Amino acid sequence: MGKKKQMRSEVKGNVKNSIGRIAFAALAVLLQIGWILILMIKLYQYSSVISLLTSLFALVVALRIYGKHTNAAFKMPWIIVILAFPVFGLCIYGLFGHKEAMHKIIRKFEDVDAQLIPLNVQDETILQQLEQEDPLLANQCHYIWKYGNYPVYDTTAVKFYPEAYLGYEEQLKELEKARHFIFLEYHAIEEAEAFARLKDVLAKKAAEGVEVRILYDDVGCIGFLDKSFIDRMNAIGVQCRVFNYVVPFLNIFMNNRDHRKIMVIDGKVGFTGGYNLADEYFNITHPYGYWKDTGVKLTGRAVQNFTMMFLEMWNVMGQADTHYEKYLKASQEGAEDGNVQKASGYVQPYADSPLDGEPVGENVYLNLIKTAKKRLYVATPYLIISDEMTRELGLAAKRGVAVRVITPGIPDKKIIYGVTRSYYSGLVRQGVRVYEYTPGFLHAKQMLCDGDTATVGTINMDYRSLYHHFENGVWMHGCDAIRDIEADFDKLLQDSEEVTDKYRDGRKNMAVRGWQCIMRLIAPLL
């Protein structure tokens, strides 16, 4: 009891310290933005010539945005804001919408990738074999390999966990077997009850000489960790790095967060899924009813893709470690396990970056939707999607595919939940059936196509995940785990309320519809 009380006290202290630091940074950034706006407005009012030039420049910028080869959903909000409020719009676009301003961090990623990508080689015989079995599936794998630089494998076993706590228990068991290295990359870590068990194992393995590294996102850990967390981890032999520190200076990269959830053990076993390392994900706490999350465990060669993802982010955020051989060799040796050699199907872990202009995560979803013939099941905590995604889901339903979309019954963010629901009517009128998970908050991110192809990972169906965050997932076909994924969807549908008829005619309340239209307009920028 005393230990738990002390832990709660430490957690409260962490919350206070981290929120204070973030609040200070946010205030400093707002003051800087305010100062720039005041200066621009003064200049704008000072001279009619400056006013005219600003308006003309706003028009030029708006035309340039219109001509960009980007998603139309991103263009419209910027064009409206810039033309309606030239000074404000130009300032905000210059600070947050101009990706070219991130050339320094983009160069860092390019330098690291130049070393890593040549080491991740695709076995062409696997692609040829898949081409003979199903050309459309081979095309999907070819896309992920060519534009994501992550190979597809056929010697990897996959285990699906329909509940976060089941995956977590298996992670603890596998960590006990670690002999060489442990990599953890998570969006959010809470130094509370769940993490305490993990911390004990990490300390034990570090004492045995196992190399242990943790990478976590600064914003994701707001209210969970303070700066001294790194010192506490270092004291037990665990190396830590923070992804994209929040600083009290204007920084366009601050909007791009590491939303990945990856654990790699000796390059042989890897985990990912929707859950972070915080109590609410394992229903130790219940802020939004029952928390429903899922995950997968990979054993075999495909784990190398996870290793590459981690090493990329680790090296970008600090001093580069170019001794990759020992980590990659371990991944290759993992396939020597006899059980893995008998693994069925194809597995392709992949990652997505907001900096390369290629929305791999969204395109993996779109490719699955386009190839669906009989049924397509989708689980996502947020449904804020592009016109293209809406159209493809609708077309699938129109050509006779049974399309089922499941979202939470209890939201974690009420405003975002309202925006999610605003997309229902556009889908159900095209034949898509929509369900809400009544026991609580559905946080799983997974898609199942025709009962034989699926993806599970961290990628929400919203603009933040699809365009702003660093994400990861696992594409799989013909694996035994897919039967478990299908069973999980069947259980989800049983536990959910169908709301299709309720939204078939759209909302009648004009005020609500007006608010939702505004939120949908700015959603791509959030």
Q: Where in the sequence are the language-model features?
A:
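C-terminal structural cap/anchor segments
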Residues: 401-405, 410-462, 466-467
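A short, conserved beta-strand element enriched in hydrophobic/aromatic residues
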Residues: 293, 379-380
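Glycine- and other small-residue-rich loops at beta-strand/loop junctions that grip anionic moieties
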Residues: 187, 381-382, 416
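A general structural signal for well-ordered alpha-helical packing
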Residues: 362, 369, 390, 403, ...
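Helical hairpin unit composed of two closely spaced alpha helices linked by a short loop
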Residues: 382-403, 408, 413
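Short, solvent-exposed amphipathic alpha-helical segments in soluble enzyme
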Residues: 392-396, 422, 490-491
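N-terminal localization/anchoring segments of enzymes in phospholipid and broader phosphate metabolism
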Residues: 1-363, 367, 371, 411, ...
